[in-house]
């Protein structure tokens, strides 16, 4: 199978390359907490030799409740991202929700993310693609893996072939998500080998059907992440928090920051093992 590789500074993102950790916070809660979380990720990934990209949102525009915290906004968020880049030398990924956000965000961060709920909005997809930035496409929960190729084609038609695909679970009835492990391979095939990554923490969301916020199953984050890494992926997308029970968004799915090092060590061991195997073609 063809495997495309995206070069981002000294980081190679590809399905047959050592996995990249896309890690950080769900949403920027404060400048100080962002610094704390990023510093921990840098410490752990440098110790373990894992390529690292910081992730967080400056605005959670799709919160269920009008009363839920959304973030500091684009202007303040970009200032925080710039400080993280200058302080720690990290690459940064964040999401956009409006066309007007695309260019100013792409001028600061290294990867712009297309949210799952917006992944079929052609005008937004085209505006993102025309920035020339690397695009991370979150597969919508309502879309089959095979349909992701249409989104990749929209981006390619704008002259941008720097695309990462991210699975964050698929609707399983009402208010629940499951991860189809066969879907990762389908996404690789229909995209002609785009790097595929796994958002393990969002895949653990589960909703109270009458509640105003998502629940989660962070007690299962290690098991689900192990399963995904055994496929052979370009990266893992992970959210952590110093105190998940106090997080302003998606705390029930977040990995406690104190558990980051043993968690990443296990993921690296699985990735190293799986990618040491020779690929077996069982198609004929």
Swiss-Prot record:
A Pfam family hit: DAHP_synth_1
GO CC term, one of those recorded: cytoplasm
SUPFAM superfamilies for this protein: Aldolase
Matching InterPro entries: Aldolase_TIM, DAHP1/KDSA, KDO8P_synthase
Subcellular location: Cytoplasm
NCBIfam families to which the protein is assigned, alphabetical: KDO8P_synth, PRK05198.1, PRK12457.1
Protein name, per record: 2-dehydro-3-deoxyphosphooctonate aldolase
Organism: Histophilus somni (strain 2336)
Gene: kdsA
